[in-house]
Amino acid sequence: MMAQTGYGCVTALYDCRSKQEYIYRTNRIREISGGSELLANVYGMFFRAAGKKGLRINSDWRSGAEFSVKAFAESGFDGEVIYEGGGNLFIMYKSRETYIRANRIFSRMLLEKTYTISVIAACVETTDNFKEDRTRLYKENSRIKSTDWISVPCNTLPITQVDRDTFMPIVKKEDNCSLSRESMLKRKAFEKSAEVGEMFLDDISGEENKGTESLLAVIYVDGNAMSKKVKACTENISGYTECTSALRRFSISADKSFVERPISAIKAKLAERTDGRHKFRRVIAGGDEITLICNARAALDVVTAYFSALDEENRSLPDDQKNYACAGIAIAHSHAPFSDVYEIAEQCCESGKKKSRAQDSRVNYVDFHFCRSGITNDMETIRETQEAGLTARPYEVSAELSGFISAGQRLSAIGRANIKDLAAAMIKGDSCYRFEVERIKSRYPAAGLDSGDEKLRKLIFDIAQVYDIWFAKTETDEQEASE
């Protein structure tokens, strides 16, 4: 029997579901940016809305103060954040009635400020064992996810004009666009973020050079084996005070390692470039997960800067606490369906994780894919039907990715046309490939080509896929090299 020493309190878990769907269900770049802002601030908006209704929630969980169920029960707060991480919010309320009241405030705020962000709420009676309470919360959360209805706030009538992507009713026309309530709120959030200096995605994609520079990259990075680490940090403890302190430290450390330091490193790396193309914007960043959108030419710099920062953080950590991650890069034109492009990025990340798991998830991997002519299949099908035996992806970051970059820079000496011819010959067959290698070797003997080198063969195929974006010399590159 569970020890009921929770002073009548309840522990609640809030979980934002279908986050990517909310962000990417539109293909309008400003609305994608606004949707990401709303999701990033949804819990802070909840705390402010609760405060206006007289519900006091202590959300200062990062201050380092020790948490105690007894101290909370005797405090003047109605609720207190235990910790937040990975899109989840753990919070304690003084009673179930307070929890219900908070949920009413939260639900109204979601409807008024975001319109369709979906949050799952679950609660259990607080005991003296945090780990057992958390397990019960996860089970309840899973039950609600599998049985709850996913609904939209407003259905439409036959006479109602609807958004062609979301089928929500159109409520306003602005800038030659028909907007739903959700679209309006996302645009409003975007305008607020733009006021404080956030990068316009229109600028990132190079809209001023439409047709020549409209390639974007969606980069999805996810930490390796983080659920095991969360479990390990509370392995030999069970009380709320001890577990909460451990989880708060872990959450802050993960955010620092996976988000804060890498983002700073990316900004510093891209600041070195003067071509105006190397820009990026965070879409989701929290815990061990981060999604970025950048100009496709910047993607390689973004990823290398990210993992350099992650490695730098690991140097100060013991072996059992070092952090590892995998990244997926999906490159597409700015008019491509972002939801599909994101899924490809996520699947590229997962292909890296499969290789990392074979090494106890203690290796960083990067995979990429160029979505040239629409997205009609998942990543696994594309690899099996179009690239089987041709690609070396995914690449281990420290050695293999460096080798890929070095090979791309070295092979640029033979020219774009020859690299493309080699890749095309691989698809035709071995004899065609060997013929092309010998032809090019006769003109460029110093290129180091060898038709029997299987590793180099796969590198050439991968380089050809992204040569124009990452390795071809631009006027700006030549100018910077001469300075």
Predicted regions and their residues:
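Regulatory and interdomain segments flanking nucleotide-handling catalytic cores
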Residues: M1-E483
